[in-house]
């Protein structure tokens, strides 16, 4: 009976895992990527054609453009879609731990290594390993990574046993690797091994036609999550969203829409629900002649007053929240309120 129960439990787990992989494959289809702009469609097209191959893919683009989304779509459109997809962000790891994270370590390899630990390459065996911010990998570890790309073998940190893996690498960076090669910070031979197929993900400011669709997607997402009945955004608010440049790209737009949904007082997102950074996009930058037309201190004070009023409006008068939105202490906010007679 115990054996039968274990067999049934195993079968149930296998069934659950299969269902989960099918759901992920559906979620991360290329068709699910929101885009109508020509530049983004070009990137999706290149990534889609590369998916069926075994080749290494290098995804380039600014932070927040959706490089990991492209990497996942490549995996789930590839013959490895039923195998693991693992991601590691090298920028989020201390430099001295990157090698151990990628290749694992043996017991006693360094202080605190009290047991053997497999790295991402072993855990992603037969699947895809997404190495984000690959430009952050130190030179000694780059040598080891090059060997994996060439031979699919490596040793764990502190070990001598050769580990064999079958892993497809999709790498990404927001840095200029060609420039890093000239400065000696990135190996040229590794670069050519990585740069077999290159996918350039455009910044959001270069794909403005996608903003309305992305805005609607995030509006619906965060309305559901926060149990809000917000289904619409005003024309004026959308105009501001279209004018803004988004230095943080799609990730910033998502943040803007989440904040707008949370702080909105009605059923429609209006301009007052948008952060000051976006609202300031409604007018062209003032020329130096206009900005210098008056006292400098008066210009600064007028801007401070406008920011404080907006923060208090967003925080519904709660000074603690307003100070947090402004990035200052509550004490500093109280001082400015007294200074400008804004009690």
Can you say where each PLM-predicted feature lies in the sequence?
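Nucleotide-binding/hydrolysis machinery
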Residues: 5, 11-12, 18, 80-83, ...
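Bacterial C-terminal helix-turn-helix
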Residues: 146, 291-343
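Regulatory hinge/linker segments at domain boundaries
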Residues: 19-45, 227-232, 239, 281-302
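Conserved post-Walker A coupling segment in P-loop NTPases
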Residues: 32, 45-111, 122-138, 203-208, ...
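Short gly/ser/thr-rich secondary-structure transition/capping motifs
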Residues: 108-115, 151-156, 289-291, 311
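AAA+/SF3 P-loop NTPase mechanochemical coupling elements
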Residues: 116-126, 130, 137-144, 155-174, ...
């Amino acid at each position: 009976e115990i054996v039968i129960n274990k067999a049934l439990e195993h079968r149930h787990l296998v069934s659950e895992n299969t269902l989960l992989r099918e759901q992920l494959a559906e979620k991360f289809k290329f068709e699910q990527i929101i885009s109508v702009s020509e530049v983004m469609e070009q990137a999706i097209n290149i990534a889609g054609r590369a998916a069926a191959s075994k080749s290494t893919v290098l995804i380039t683009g600014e932070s927040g453009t959706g490089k990991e989304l492209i990497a996942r779509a490549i995996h789930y459109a590839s013959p490895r879609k039923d195998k693991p997809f693992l991601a590691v962000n090298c920028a989020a790891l201390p430099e001295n731990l990157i090698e151990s994270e990628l290749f694992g370590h043996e017991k006693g390899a360094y202080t605190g290594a009290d047991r053997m630990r497999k790295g991402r390459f072993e855990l992603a065996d037969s699947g895809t390993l997404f190495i984000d911010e690959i430009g952050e990998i130190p030179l000694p570890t780059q040598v080891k990574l090059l060997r994996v790309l060439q031979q699919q073998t490596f040793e764990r940190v502190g070990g001598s046993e050769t580990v064999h893996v079958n892993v497809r690498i999709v790498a990404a960076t927001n840095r200029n690797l060609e420039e890093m090669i000239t400065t000696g910070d990135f190996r040229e031979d590794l670069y050519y091994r990585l740069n077999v197929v290159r996918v350039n993900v455009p910044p959001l400011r270069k794909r403005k036609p996608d903003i309305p669709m992305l805005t609607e997607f995030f509006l619906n997402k965060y309305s559901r999550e926060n149990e809000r009945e917000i289904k619409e955004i005003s024309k004026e608010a959308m105009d501001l969203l279209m004018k803004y440049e988004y230095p943080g790209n799609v990730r910033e737009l998502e943040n803007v829409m989440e904040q707008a949904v949370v702080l909105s007082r009605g059923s429609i997102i209006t301009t007052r629900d948008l952060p000051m950074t976006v609202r300031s996009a409604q007018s062209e930058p003032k020329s130096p002649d206009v900005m210098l037309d008056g006292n400098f201190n008066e210009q600064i004070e007028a801007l401070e007053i406008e920011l404080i009023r907006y923060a208090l409006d967003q925080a519904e008068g709660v000074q603690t929240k307003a100070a947090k939105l402004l990035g200052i202490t509550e004490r500093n906010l109280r001082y400015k309120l007294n200074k400008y007679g804004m009690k």
